[in-house]
Amino acid sequence: VTSYAPDDRVMVSPRYMAGAGDRLADAIGPLIHLFGWSTQHDAATGHVAIDSPDGSVFVDFNPIQPLGRWWTIAHHEPYWEVQFSRQTPLEAVAAATQALPQLLGDTRHAERIPITDMPLDQLAALNGWSVEDGVLTSPDWCCQLRHTPNEDIVWRSEHAFFEKPPLATFTRDVPEGLVRNFFAHLTAPMAVERAFADVPLSTRFEHSDLITPVRGAVISPHVDHALAQLDRPGRRR
């Protein structure tokens, strides 16, 4: 078993086992710098509030939210809401936040920020997830995206090893493009980079084979990680 210092950079896959990570700028930076959304930042608490130019959407990041619901995206008329937890990979959060301007009709930078049109069941099959009775389940059974069309929350992503709240919730009337983009980046097979201290405890201690070091990679961190996963036991095909 490899020993890591807290600040060692490591590669982790699958992404839903990697925790949030530290690339907060990817989730909020494009809205501010590319699309001119207004922002308020409380340096003492880390709270960030971002509003769309027309005032129809706001994005709220609150890292001291007591229930761990760090992210809220809300739209007015019709009202819909998306929430992400403190363990949701920022790659998946950013895939949703960066899609917001385009979904509101601002097509600038659309070529740089694609919104996938692949149906969710095809995305699941592409990445080895199973689909049954409205539930999309990861190959290792650790993560699910559940569709409950008759409830107020119509999509819910949950993780077997993380405490509540869910990784993500989507209420009725959320554009499905947001759900697709989130799911595409949650299930993508490419490993993500983390500081070891940011990797969830359950992954560090119970699934340490999912972690490989960045430093000392023979080919590249991504390739070395992929090769290390080829013979990992317990993978459902």
Q: Would you name each region that the model predicts?
A:
Residues 1-237:
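Compositionally biased accessory segments in Actinobacterial proteins
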